[in-house]
A protein has these predicted regions:
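Active-site-proximal alpha-helix that buttresses catalytic centers in soluble enzyme cores
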Residues: 20-109, 121-162
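N-terminal export signals
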Residues: 5-20
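Short beta-strand segments
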Residues: 116-118
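Alpha-to-beta junction loops
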Residues: 111-113
């Protein structure tokens, strides 16, 4: 019986050691992170409503200076970002959708960057950044997460498209 308890305990310790740890990430002063979920989808493709929403995103951010656009490699995310990328003359940089926040913030201090994500990576991003309130998980939600020159974080939520 003691051996079974020992092995069970050892198994739990090993399992805990293999569990990824999410570390807190800080937005550098002067940095703006714009977060949006991909448009409406059918499988991995955008529906006509999703295509319209992608165009609406480009219109909503037409006057916003954006330095970099990041997305997962899913077609629906890239298709959501394409009209905006084209309008701004930017490429879309794909990032694996696990542990996104440190990957997209690295080397972007003082810049404005856009993340076109999914429910499964936007919600953890909110947690990693220590943000309160609801993450922008609905179609048409648009979040502007800003760190002012002192590093104080503010979040402005808006909607775009119909």
């Amino acid at each position: 019986m003691e051996r079974r308890q020992f092995l069970t305990g050892l198994g739990l310790v090993c399992l805990m050691a293999c569990t990824p740890r999410t570390q807190s990430v800080t937005l550098s002063p002067g940095t703006t992170l714009i977060v949006v979920r991909h448009g409406e989808k059918d499988g991995d493709a955008l529906t006509s409503a999703g295509v319209a929403r992608a165009e609406a995103l480009a219109s909503a951010l037409a006057d916003t200076d954006i330095d970099r656009i990041y997305s997962t490699s899913y077609h629906r995310n890239i298709a959501t970002a394409e009209p905006l990328a084209e309008a701004h003359g930017l490429s879309i940089e794909t990032v694996p959708d696990f542990d996104v926040t440190p990957k997209i913030l690295a080397g972007n201090a003082g810049r404005t960057i856009l993340w076109v994500g999914n429910k499964g990576n936007i919600a953890p991003m909110w947690d990693v950044l220590g943000l309160t309130g609801d993450a922008p998980l609905a179609y048409g939600d648009l979040a502007f997460v800003r760190a002012d020159e002192t590093g104080r974080i503010s979040v402005a939520m808006t909607r775009f498209g119909s």
